[in-house]
């Protein structure tokens, strides 16, 4: 196995698209071949070696490491199927888009559309992420369907838009409308939500440990539950939560919704 190490040479003023650099694709390539790969940069192309200092070494796993990265470096890990990508620094838009397997770790912040249409694998952002984490493409109604996304900091608006499956975990706070149009999967938010969680939600579950600042009136109070086992389907083994929660169902702007919303009672007594 090989590890490709890319060290960004300097400031990038025009966005660079990294979708051609995947762990599984570079295993049979030489250093010279990798250095000569043409990357889209704005309305032109540039060779990998023009933007990065390139190293190649043996590794236990197929791996790509990007050092000194910035938010102008986009589409990292797009359609990745296996291996590992480590980003030291910030990452641009569309990281892990349509990813099916493997693992991406960003040691920094990420721009919008982290894990758009994610199908499998794992993405960890050790920082903040902007809008549309785990969302669908514009105009599509099929969002993330598998895998796991973890944001250790805060996230922006409309995370989990049209979520169908998989898990999104936010360790910090989120802006408005997490789980909008959600149709499966689970969103766990350990911090506060600015409001409107689960708008037009049909299926799936949202768990909020912090405070829901602007709850939607179209959710139905189902009771107080202790250490609930959250099941997303009849065959699902379930996810065991610890603590006391206020349970709601919704969103009743839809017909016969099966969405579940759990709010930790210690931070949401005003919702009872």
Curated annotation (Swiss-Prot):
The EC number(s) given in the record are 1.2.7.12
GO aspect biological process, one term? methanogenesis, from carbon dioxide
| Chain segments carrying region 7 X 13 AA repeats of [GW]-X-X-[MLP]-X-X-G-X-[IL]-X-[IV]-X-G | 77-210
Query: What subunit structure does UniProt give?
Result: This enzyme is composed of seven subunits fwdA (65 kDa), fwdB (53 kDa), fwdC (31 kDa), fwdD (15 kDa), fwdE, fwdF and fwdG.
Pathway given for this chain reads:
One-carbon metabolism; methanogenesis from CO(2); 5,10-methenyl-5,6,7,8-tetrahydromethanopterin from CO(2): step 1/3
| Reaction(s) the record says it catalyses | N-formylmethanofuran + 2 oxidized [2Fe-2S]-[ferredoxin] + H2O = methanofuran + 2 reduced [2Fe-2S]-[ferredoxin] + CO2 + H(+)
**Family, per the entry?**
Belongs to the FwdC/FmdC family.
- Top-level taxon: Archaea
Q: Which Gene3D superfamilies did the record assign?
A: Glutamate synthase, alpha subunit, C-terminal domain (2.160.20.60)
Enzyme class, one word? oxidoreductase
The gene name reads: fwdC
Name the PANTHER family for this protein: TUNGSTEN FORMYLMETHANOFURAN DEHYDROGENASE, SUBUNIT C (FWDC), TUNGSTEN-CONTAINING FORMYLMETHANOFURAN DEHYDROGENASE 2 SUBUNIT C
Q: Which GO terms describe its molecular function?
A: formylmethanofuran dehydrogenase activity; transition metal ion binding
Placement of sequence repeats on the sequence: 77-89, 96-108, 115-127, 141-153, 160-172, 179-191, 198-210
Q: Which InterPro entries match?
A: FMH_DH_FwdC, Formylmethanofuran_DH_suC, Glu_synth_asu_C, Glu_synth_asu_C_sf
Kindly state which keywords UniProt assigns to this record, in alphabetical order. Methanogenesis, Oxidoreductase, Repeat
What protein name applies here? Tungsten-containing formylmethanofuran dehydrogenase 2 subunit C
Q: What does this protein do?
A: Catalyzes the reversible oxidation of CO(2) and methanofuran (MFR) to N-formylmethanofuran (CHO-MFR). This enzyme is oxygen-labile.
Q: Return any one Pfam family short name.
A: GXGXG
